[in-house]
Amino acid sequence: MFTAVRATLRPNAVACKRCFSSLSVQLKQAGGGKIMTPKAAIADIPVGAKVMVGGFGLCGVPRTLLDEVVKRPELKDLDVYSNNLGTPGRGVGLLAREGRVRSITGSFLGGNREFGDQFFRGEVQLNLCPQGTFAERIRAGAAGIPAFYTPTGYGTAVHKGELVLKYEKKEGEEAKPVLISKPRESRRFGNRDFILEEAIYGDYALIHARKADEAGNLIFHSTARNFNDPMARNARVTIAEVEEIVPVGSISSDEVHLPSIFVDRIVKAELPLEVEKVCLSKPEGDATELTKRDIIAKRAAAELSDGMYVNLGVGMPNLVPSYLSKDVDVYVHTENGLLGVGPYPSREEDVHTDIINAGKESITERPDAAAFDAVASFDIVRGGHLDVTMLGALQVTANGDLANYMIPGKFATGMGGAMDLVSNPDNTRVIVLTEHVDKTGKPKVVQNTELPLTGVRCVSTIITDLAVFNVDREKGGLTLVELQPGVTLEEVKAKTGADFKVAL
């Protein structure tokens, strides 16, 4: 049984009128005694606890607290809730490497193949969940809401109950699923379809913040806020690892991101944070021959207009800003919690551990940027407030179905925020950027796909290294509207796995 007392009980409290006098009243400071050592802060976490771990990749990860958890060899069979699994031996990956995890609930494995291997050997359970849905399930649990309807994932394996959660534990044999996800209830509101998702609840939350006062009011910094804020509101016991502790009164009420009522214990951070991918901008004039990826990104830039709010997915879409004309200024949103992404830093000394994009790359902020937590970020996404989102693809079909996160039987990184990004295509135009054929020469633009879907009838435009197609999402069908320089119609026909009309 897990309990936590968040307030001082006053059995003799009485109602009083709001009145004024010259009487001096001494107020008791709230939250006294919250500051403690890392060892003491995590000492009562039991075997089998549900532990939420904040952070996005390595950004905003409570590194000091995770290090302390590992020092308790008996602390195993943890059900961990973390959007990302860090990297092997770093971030939440440290818990996985040490064999402390029974199950992980999150949206993205990233490059943590160690955990992927454990999953396929049947040693751990993996509950994949779209990133925005994951954030909302945490928020719902914090707010006392047991379930909610979302458009994210409708028509996909999430909706149909086709995700493998655990494999049979056998050595040297092909892995066989022993646990499959449950189908989601669906319902239609207006002219849109939604699925029912249930709230999740944590026993403990291990989070990181920039600053805390002695009462437990917290301030986060830039994209390091991510899942730290909503997880702190959710768990029965929240342990905040902070870079700076200041006296009460040092933080104005308007500056507080997370009120003290949600924070039970405060620990001073002892280990520095890390950047997963240090990326620096190229010097002007450093021209190289355009690759296929560059050709696609350059053409995609022409789809953006001045003043647009856009989300650029991991990989090829991130190249698009480099090819925007000087008279086009767009606001780039990144799902880990920033609107107003700037260029890569020009020097290593300008790299900040708290400022990254969804690909875990170091970035800068525009002067007019705004940072927020994961819940607010996906309010922007799911609510259709973005003008355009650009994503990569494994395959895309003639009716606009997108598959871009999993090839069955192979290592799956997870869907991340992609299912959310394509969940409102009537308000946010979805543009796919992809090479026309895969590494084996097979078409990626196809009539139908057997790959797990990211979204149904969601893609409006397909841009490849050979051509540009418009998609009729309502009736189905492709129209070829443009050929890339030097490409012939015959080549496009030969390398496309779907019928299409021609309107060149």
Region locations from a protein language model:
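N-terminal/domain-start segments enriched in small and hydrophobic, helix-friendly residues
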Residues: 22-31, 198, 297, 301-304, ...
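N-terminal low-complexity or amphipathic/hydrophobic leaders
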Residues: 51-52, 59-71, 297, 303-305, ...
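N-terminal mitochondrial targeting presequence
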Residues: 1-31
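Beta-strand segments within the central parallel beta-sheet cores of soluble alpha/beta enzyme folds
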Residues: 78-83, 331-335
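Short acidic loop-to-helix transition motifs that present clustered carboxylates
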Residues: 86-88, 316-317
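Glycine-rich phosphate/diphosphate-binding loops that line cofactor/substrate pockets in enzymes
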Residues: 40-50, 138, 303-308
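Conserved phosphate- and dinucleotide-binding cores of soluble alpha/beta proteins
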Residues: 20, 29-36, 42, 57-71, ...
